[in-house]
Amino acid sequence: GNNGNNPSSEIKLELSETHLFASSDAITKTVALTANADWSIDQNFTESEWAWCSVTPTYGSAGTTTLTVDIQANGYDKRIHDFSIRSGDTDILLTIEQKQVVYFL
């Protein structure tokens, strides 16, 4: 028994980018997720919230997966949202930050 200190048993969960910035326009961005075990994404929107961004796919297995982040056009308030990506006991966040519409008079 190596008391669970075997490095091969550690969860690896990495994003090519952890914080995406978007202008107020609708846009689709992609992020690479690399994992060595099954993973899933919690969109973290409650039923009463407007889900202004989404990530697909929401689950997968070991390897590198391209996540597609769809961001809808924004109004007059800057907004930010965290998606939780979980594999085993490991959790990482993907943060989406979107600028508000700016009027030039």
Where do the protein language model's features map onto the residues?
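Bacterial Sec-dependent N-terminal signal peptides
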Residues: 1-16, 101-104
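Short, solvent-exposed loop/linker segments at the N-terminal edge
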Residues: 20-25
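Short strand-edge motifs at loop-to-beta-strand transitions and within beta-strands
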Residues: 29-31, 65-69
